[in-house]
């Protein structure tokens, strides 16, 4: 089970741009936009999750991931999701609760042909129902990650 910690990895600067996951073989943390001092919460961990992805994120953070029960305001949610895991809309709505206004949810699913694969259309359909907007996706080894954010009009209102 993941343990709570604050990400405090010192970023380096090269040519004016921040290097987040310096020279990690797959640069998973960089692809996910993980930055120092972010609070990152993990949902849906199971035996099949990719330890390389988790390690890259933890390396970039300088610590371990927060679990689902944290009371902290979260910058990034890493949601491992597989076909048969339940209702994605309900889980996304639960994950939004502690999410910062400008926070990001990454829905990480097995790639096509892998057990538990989820169609990207299912994520795209669930997102607006949960009050989120899909923005992009990245490949992470045998997993694919879809980036979801709160619409600016909703997030900007206080």
From Swiss-Prot:
Pfam families documented for this protein = DUF3052
Under InterPro entries, the record lists: DUF3052
- What protein name applies here? Uncharacterized protein Mb2263c
């Amino acid at each position: 089970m993941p343990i709570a910690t604050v990400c405090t990895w010192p970023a380096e600067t090269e040519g004016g741009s921040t290097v987040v996951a310096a020279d990690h073989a797959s640069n998973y943390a960089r692809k996910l936009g993980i930055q120092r001092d972010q609070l990152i919460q993990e949902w849906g961990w199971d035996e099949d999750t990719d330890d390389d992805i988790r390690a890259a994120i933890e390396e970039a953070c300088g610590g371990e991931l927060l679990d689902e029960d944290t009371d902290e305001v979260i910058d990034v949610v890493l949601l491992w999701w597989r076909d048969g895991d339940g209702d994605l809309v309900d889980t996304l709505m639960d994950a939004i609760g502690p999410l910062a206004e400008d926070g990001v949810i990454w829905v990480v699913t097995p790639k096509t042909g892998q057990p538990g694969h989820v169609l990207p259309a299912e994520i795209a359909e669930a997102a607006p129902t949960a009050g989120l907007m899909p923005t992009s996706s990245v490949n992470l080894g045998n997993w694919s990650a879809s980036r979801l954010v709160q619409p600016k009009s909703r997030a900007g209102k206080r």
